[in-house]
Amino acid sequence: MNKLFHTSKVLFATLLLAMIMMTTSCSSEGDFYSKVPEDARFVMSIKAKGLAEKSNAVKKMREIANLVGEQEAKDAADMLETLFGDDSPVDLNNIVMFEYEGNVYAWLMVNDVEMLDKIDAIAENFEKSKKDDFVIYEANENCCIVMNGNGGLMMMGNDADSDDAIKAFMDFDDLESDKAIANNEIFMKNMQGDDDVYLYLDIEGLTSLVGSTAELKKALSREFENEGLSVPDYIDEVMESFVYASASFTKDAATLKMSLLDDKGTNIINKIYGNKTIDKKILSYLDKNSSFVMACSLPEQGKKMIEQALSNSLPEEMKSTASEIVRHLDGNMAFGITVTDSIMAVKEKYDYWSDSYYTTTEPDFTRCGYTFVAKCNTKMDDYLSSLAGYLGMSVTNGVITIPNDEMNITIKSDGDYVVVSNVGTPAQSLAGSDLANDKQLLMYFDCSKNSSISSLINSELPIDLDATTTLTLDKECAMLTIHVGNNKKDNILEYCFDLIIDIAKSK
């Protein structure tokens, strides 16, 4: 925890100055975007004031500072009190930063420039000067802020000198409307609204910062070709696309949404997947109390990747059977893990240095339940018989049983489904669950209050964990949601702050 706050005074002062200045005059993302060039490769908007209020950040940071006792932590708490306290001289709304030609910029607005000189962290770490109509604040060669009236521009980069910053200020301030990123309708549709954070990435533009985009495409194509795949069209579409992401925080949930769009606003992932969605029946083979669930509906290229991976890893005599099985997959697969309360086991260990034995308690993952399900486009009985023959085993009532010292694994065919499991048919399944409805991908992690995972964590840490995490992909976007139950705080961010504080107190 202490290491978290070992930051330099210059970095702290830069952050303070940037947060103070990115305020007031521009009250919405759109106001800032009109001064951002259309070919910016990275844009981020954060509603700082709203996030601070939701998380009760001022109070919580003070608690952490008192707990840690480090000066850097106390400085950070002082900063938040200055910015977000009741007597704050500024009104924080949106912070918008962007990348352009290798440097990072942020438009800055403040009502009272003179107040900056009264803040110790600024006065001690920034050198103030004037040039023509500009007031200049310089921390070092990597950070420079130039101000003209109430407007200012922060520039961060390898050679962020005041002359370059002044030129950038004038160029961006006089930006013609059709040269601003605000002129991009797709950008504006996806980068403003009620969410708390917005992010835009130009993939091709960003990759060009580290080398030739064309060479990177060729390298990726070669890697896929080595796996027996030809996906140049997909690579081109992904590399030439744009990431749009947003995050929101409510009382019960933190939600991150992300889309990959082309320059016409078409969803690239949806183009690759087509109209395939997860089979509704497949979850019925998984335990209702599964701690972790993953389900997907693979596109054709995904099936080819599995076939190639099996071909590269299996013995020669098994390759033909495995290939036949993969060819009959329709792309729907699901996997579940059920963690039980008995997962912790006492084991005897040998210590080489002391030449003695000792006991320890650690997870025994063989005590978990595992189930893998694949849907096929034909009945798989004959193929399972071929597999059993290779393994030297028989098929009994459509089931192959593979004995093991630690667990028994069964492989069975149930109509169009192949099920591999060490626990058999669950007493209660996820049949009827809407988790995978209209989804192309689902991942679910259960740490709800009465779950085995939550009980195990709560036994080790003094926290009351009650949460589930869900990652889904559908025709619109990818979405990650962390949901907390019975939250006694006003927002999930404050809930997370309290978890951190409780864990820190236990150390």
Predicted feature residues:
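Bacterial N-terminal signal peptides that target proteins for export
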Residues: 2-13
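Bacterial N-terminal signal peptides
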Residues: 12-23
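Structural boundary/hinge residues at secondary-structure and domain interfaces
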Residues: 26-140, 180-364, 500-507
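A short, solvent-exposed beta-edge/loop patch
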Residues: 44, 137-171, 294, 406-435, ...
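Hydrophobic lipid-interacting interfaces of membrane-associated proteins
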Residues: 49, 158-163, 202-208, 261-265, ...
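Long compositionally biased, domain-poor regions of proteins
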Residues: 90, 328-382, 389-391, 397-408, ...
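Short Gly/Thr-rich strand-loop-strand
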Residues: 110-149, 363-366, 377-416, 439-463
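Long, C-terminal catalytic modules of enzymes
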Residues: 432-507
